[in-house]
């Protein structure tokens, strides 16, 4: 049976004639069924013929609709070429179905064309699987028989017999749908099967309730008239029988079966007749647990919004051109003067308990399911998912922590960056061609997929790497494939990415020489091995490598034959952090003058990094030089420069506003000039034996006016603790030269005549300087506590993160990025961004000391009282300006939500929590980290695609929706429900919401990021120019000239009553940490400590 056909196709006239013949055939079938029905009194036969007549009539309707569409297309194709092109695109795009797989297995299917395409592909896949089962059981039976194990051989033979029976059913069903199919690729495009989302194949755990009422129109096994047949329905979960009904002789049951499923995927319903004491399958169908859960979720959403007048934006009268809302106060679009409450909604019930709400929202699916090859089953289904992480999303607004995808272990091979991935559908290994279930190794760059055992055998280099990057073994076999479009009418897998190929011709290519098939987007990734499989290429290369000696091995033998002179110490490669920083550097260099860039790059090439110093052998120095090495902190403070370990931050400070004065917290080892020289050298070898975790000797050096204007070098703390040789002195001189050039090119001139030898005021910074008063909040990544400075009695909020958690999750660079974002916010003292006082570290934790905002967060306030339109718009304007500042500085926020927006005592907002911010994100820059809070994540993040800074505007739309309507636009019981709602659901709005409000929400919540409001080069200005904000003077907003619509109640400076009691009721203490970090782990936090210029603590 052919599974693909050449690209040649019938002309439209031939297709129309074929359709007419099919219509005439179905009409004759209906006539024959009517004749048989008149000549019999058997109720079963009459019912069966009625169903056949209904089925044939639906086929006639489908053929008639298809023929009319093709006729209209032919009429348009007869026009001139330009209009023909336009009409073709319009014909193809005029029908875009959006049906789930569960919709397609229903008897009353909403789209017969989609069902035909889906069942053709699905049945062929099932047929391939059953054929493999049959072959495997046949081999097992033979092997057991050879070993004399007759019982095991009979069991395997029974499995083979059942597989053969299923194969007969599948072949019969496949022929039925092939007969219905229309062989024209233009309609394949119309009825293309939807791509499953990345969450649609997850294994689910929960309780499945199945209630089978009856079956009908099933072709039972013929039996003697005196002997009634016995029929049962068997329910299998992932090919394992879990339940079966009692035998029935009239196809009726009234049984309810409850099945506990654990990490399962597929449910099978098989109707079986008893024949010679053995039950034989006569009809079968399958559905995914996820598809059932998605069907139930959609019913819950429809139940919540159906009775309260919520409609999609396209169906609302005010967006269709009428312009007027229901209420006069809402027609203008929520101006600052609008104080009317927003439309109520039946979902806002603050007193409903989760248990009672769950009982009320219990929804089941009752429907007729189609059986293959024929028949229907009336069934009632319910599935209650187990919420393993305890996060409930349904109901009123609540707090939900952010998530971040854990960095995966990377396995490199010829430039491929292989990571282990989970797949919940059948995949194909691109190397050996065998099926791959559940897990496989996929390249992060080119998406090459293979088994874990096969990734070491990959012979081709990753297409994303240049040819000189990796020394991959080469074959002289260089014959390119000849890929051409092909119409796929079967189940085939891509020879590169391993995914199943779609039905039709739109996205499928086949080599006309060797026959391999792939997606259209994968053709340039397939290696030029036409006529040779990758497995064969691997075997040839292995043979070649085993018969020759590599050049490296020959050099190794020569080096052992002749002694070599001693070599100088070899510097190791830069750390990954340094490489990443240097890799990102060009986008910043465009902001620098050319001369400064030249100086910096020269300096980078000469100055060793901390990782290099860590592996260098100790340098033996003469006694005089050793005496000079011991730096007292006083001499060091004036004569040398404190160099930062965080090269990324240092570079960023040189690139943006270098004239910002900074207070430097030294994080180096404390030395005593009177110590013994041998002890000094021992300390320099292992500086972390007595690391200054508690910042006992950390000094805050407040510089004089002239010294404060000096910009901190981009390489602070990299050479601390290393003996200062003459070469180091020369490097320090170079640093000073760079600084002088930067001062001339970038800093403001100061008329200061003060001496550089002025004394400095010093103070200690550490955990003992603060007293914890209360817990303000907790998240997935840390805890925030209210603290009081013991020196100034000022209040501050301290974010505490455990080092072992940071190391375990590879978040050290993220923490450094968060610090840099804080400094960016401090740079202009933006009124709507949270500012940083200082940050420091202890042996087991790091601390961000931030300004304390006593008004609480917006989540706490919206749970107490609904926001008026005026208040919601006021907060939205200030949030908009805060995000604009971030975007103007190349930062995407990625965690916008009510929990992260704080309210000051004057009623203005402050955006806080910069843990998920991403730097170097300018217009058209993209990233792909899966992170954020589920309800606020943009569709492109959920789909695992690369995304840009417009994800913040999607989150801004969700935030505005929540503030205006006091609920989320996307609902579900857990994260997977939320993700699928974000990808698939259409946002609904109250019918009396104003026109401009609906339009701005619709523009922000556009699933296509390229069409989303704010996605253009103007960024936030696009949103500011929207008619919804027509009455807003953003200059007044930025300067806080507009009176706040609400002032939070604060009794005293120490009042924290505006924060959630869930947090404030906890005891403010640090839990003991038993983890001991190695010196290598502590190295990741070098240079973290810092005090801002405007710190008031």
Swiss-Prot record:
Sequence ranges of Low complexity compositional bias: 327-340, 730-741
First and last residues of each zinc finger (Phorbol-ester/DAG-type): 415-462, 480-530
Q: Which SUPFAM superfamilies match?
A: C2 domain (Calcium/lipid-binding domain, CaLB), Cysteine-rich domain, HR1 repeat, Protein kinase-like (PK-like)
Tell me the GO BP annotations in alphabetical order: cellular bud neck septin ring organization; cellular response to starvation; filamentous growth; fungal-type cell wall biogenesis; intracellular signal transduction; pexophagy; positive regulation of cytoplasmic mRNA processing body assembly; regulation of fungal-type cell wall organization
Stated EC number for the protein is: 2.7.11.13
Q: Which residues form the AGC-kinase C-terminal domain?
A: 1030-1097
Gene Ontology molecular function: ATP binding; diacylglycerol-dependent serine/threonine kinase activity; protein serine kinase activity; zinc ion binding
Domain of life where this protein originates = Eukaryota
**Compositional bias (Basic residues):** 747-763
Active site at which residues?
895
Concerning PANTHER family, the annotation shows: RIBOSOMAL PROTEIN S6 KINASE
Please state what the protein is called.
Answer: Protein kinase C-like 1
Species in which this protein is naturally found: Candida albicans (Yeast)
């Amino acid at each position: 049976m052919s599974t693909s056909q050449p690209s040649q196709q019938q002309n439209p006239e031939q297709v129309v004639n074929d359709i007419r013949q099919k219509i005439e055939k179905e009409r004759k079938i209906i006539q024959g069924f009517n004749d048989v029905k008149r000549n019999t009194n058997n109720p079963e036969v009459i019912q069966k013929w009625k169903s056949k007549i209904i089925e044939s009539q639906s086929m006639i309707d489908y053929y008639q609709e298809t023929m009319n569409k093709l006729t209209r297309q032919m009429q348009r194709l007869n026009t001139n070429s330009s209009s023909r092109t336009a009409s073709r695109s319009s014909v193809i795009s005029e029908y875009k179905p959006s049906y789930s797989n569960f919709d397609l297995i229903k008897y009353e299917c909403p789209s017969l064309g989609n069902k035909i395409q889906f069942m053709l592909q699905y049945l062929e896949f099932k047929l391939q699987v059953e054929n493999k089962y049959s072959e495997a059981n046949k081999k097992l039976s033979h092997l057991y028989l050879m070993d004399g194990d007759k019982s095991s051989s009979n069991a395997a033979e029974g499995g083979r017999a059942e597989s053969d029976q299923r194969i007969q059913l599948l072949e019969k069903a496949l022929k039925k749908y092939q007969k219905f199919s229309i062989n024209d690729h233009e309609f394949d495009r119309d009825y293309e099967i939807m791509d499953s989302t990345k969450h649609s194949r997850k294994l689910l755990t929960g309780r499945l309730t199945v209630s089978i009422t009856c079956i009908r129109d099933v072709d039972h096994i013929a039996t003697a008239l005196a002997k009634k047949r016995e029929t049962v329905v068997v329910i299998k979960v992932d090919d394992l029988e879990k339940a079966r009904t009692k035998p029935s002789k009239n196809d009726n049951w009234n049984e309810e079966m409850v099945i506990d499923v654990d990490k399962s995927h597929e449910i099978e319903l098989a109707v079986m007749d008893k024949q010679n004491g053995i039950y034989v399958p006569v009809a079968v169908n399958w559905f995914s647990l996820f598809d059932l859960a998605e069907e139930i979720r959609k019913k819950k959403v429809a139940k919540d919004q159906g009775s309260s007048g919520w409609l999609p934006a396209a169906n609302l009268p005010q967006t269709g051109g009428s312009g007027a809302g229901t209420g006069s106060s809402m027609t203008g679009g929520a101006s600052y003067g609008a104080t009317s409450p927003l439309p109520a909604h039946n979902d806002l019930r603050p007193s409903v308990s989760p248990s009672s709400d769950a009982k009320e929202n219990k929804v089941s699916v009752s429907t007729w399911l189609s059986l293959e090859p024929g028949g229907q089953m009336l069934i009632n289904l319910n599935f209650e998912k187990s919420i393993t992480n305890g996060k409930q999303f349904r109901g009123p607004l609540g707090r939900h922590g952010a998530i971040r995808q854990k960095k995966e272990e990377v396995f490199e091979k010829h430039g491929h960056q292989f990571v282990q991935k989970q797949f919940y559908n059948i995949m194909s290994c691109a190397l050996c061609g065998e099926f791959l279930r559940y897990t496989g190794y996929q390249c992060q760059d080119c998406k090459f997929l293979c088994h874990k055992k096969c990734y070491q055998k990959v012979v081709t280099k990753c297409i994303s790497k240049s040819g000189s990057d990796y020394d991959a073994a080469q074959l002289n076999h260089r014959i390119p494939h000849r890929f051409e479009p092909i119409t796929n009418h079967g189940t085939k897998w891509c020879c590169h990415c391993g995914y199943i190929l779609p039905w039709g011709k739109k996205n499928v290519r086949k080599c006309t020489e060797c026959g391999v098939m792939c997606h259209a987007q994968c053709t340039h990734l397939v290696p030029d091995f036409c006529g040779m499989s990758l497995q064969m290429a691997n075997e040839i290369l292995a043979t070649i490598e085993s018969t020759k000696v590599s050049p490296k091995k020959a050099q190794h033998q020569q080096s052992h034959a002749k002694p070599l002179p001693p070599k100088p110490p070899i510097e190791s490669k830069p750390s990954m952090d340094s490489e990443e920083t240097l890799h990102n550097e060009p986008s910043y260099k465009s902001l620098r003058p050319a001369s400064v860039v030249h100086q910096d790059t020269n300096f980078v090439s000469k100055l060793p990094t901390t990782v290099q110093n860590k592996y260098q052998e100790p340098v033996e120095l003469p006694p005089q030089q050793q005496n000079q090495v011991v730096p007292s902190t006083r001499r060091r403070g004036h004569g040398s420069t404190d160099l930062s370990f965080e090269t990324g931050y240092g570079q960023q400070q040189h690139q943006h506003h270098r004239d910002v004065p900074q207070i430097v917290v030294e994080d180096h080892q404390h030395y005593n000039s009177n110590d013994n020289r041998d002890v000094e050298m021992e300390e320099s070898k292992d500086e972390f034996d007595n690391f200054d975790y508690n910042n006992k000797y950390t000094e805050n050096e407040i510089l004089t006016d002239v010294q404060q204007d000096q910009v901190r070098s981009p390489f602070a703390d990299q050479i601390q603790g290393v003996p200062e040789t003459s070469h180091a002195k020369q490097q320090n001189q170079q640093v000073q030269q760079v600084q002088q050039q930067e001062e001339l090119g970038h800093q403001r001139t100061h008329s200061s005549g003060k001496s550089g030898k002025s004394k400095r005021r010093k103070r200690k910074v550490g955990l003992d300087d603060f007293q914890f008063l209360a817990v303000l909040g907790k998240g997935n990544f840390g805890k925030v506590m209210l603290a009081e400075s013991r020196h100034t009695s000022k209040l501050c909020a301290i974010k505490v993160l455990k080092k072992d958690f940071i190391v375990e999750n590879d978040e050290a660079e993220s923490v450094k990025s968060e610090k840099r974002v804080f400094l960016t916010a401090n740079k202009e003292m933006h009124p709507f961004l949270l500012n940083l006082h200082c940050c420091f570290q202890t042996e087991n934790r790091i601390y961000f000391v931030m300004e304390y905002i006593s008004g609480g967060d917006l989540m706490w306030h919206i749970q107490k009282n609904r926001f008026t339109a005026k208040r919601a718009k006021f907060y939205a304007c200030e949030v908009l300006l805060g995000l604009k500042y971030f975007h103007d500085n190349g930062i995407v926020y990625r965690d916008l939500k009510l929990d992260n927006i704080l309210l000051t005592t004057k009623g203005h907002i402050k955006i806080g929590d910069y843990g998920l911010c991403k730097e170097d994100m300018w217009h058209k820059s993209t990233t792909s980290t899966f992170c954020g809070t589920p309800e606020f994540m943009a569709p492109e993040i959920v789909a695992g695609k690369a995304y840009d800074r417009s994800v913040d505007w999607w989150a801004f739309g969700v935030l505005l929706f929540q503030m205006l309507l006091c609920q989320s636009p996307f609902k579900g019981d857990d994260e997977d429900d939320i993700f699928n709602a974000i990808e698939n659901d259409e946002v609904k709005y109250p019918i009396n919401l104003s026109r401009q409000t609906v339009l701005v929400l619709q523009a922000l919540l556009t699933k296509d990021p390229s069409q989303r409001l704010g996605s253009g080069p103007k960024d936030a200005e696009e949103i500011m120019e929207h008619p919804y904000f027509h009455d807003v003077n953003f200059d007044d907003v930025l300067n806080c000239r507009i009176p706040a619509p609400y002032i939070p109640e604060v009794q005293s400076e120490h009042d924290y009553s505006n924060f959630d009691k869930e947090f404030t009721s906890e005891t403010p203490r640090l839990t003991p940490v038993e983890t001991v970090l190695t010196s290598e782990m502590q190295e990741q936090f070098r240079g973290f400590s810092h005090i801002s210029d405007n710190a008031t603590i």
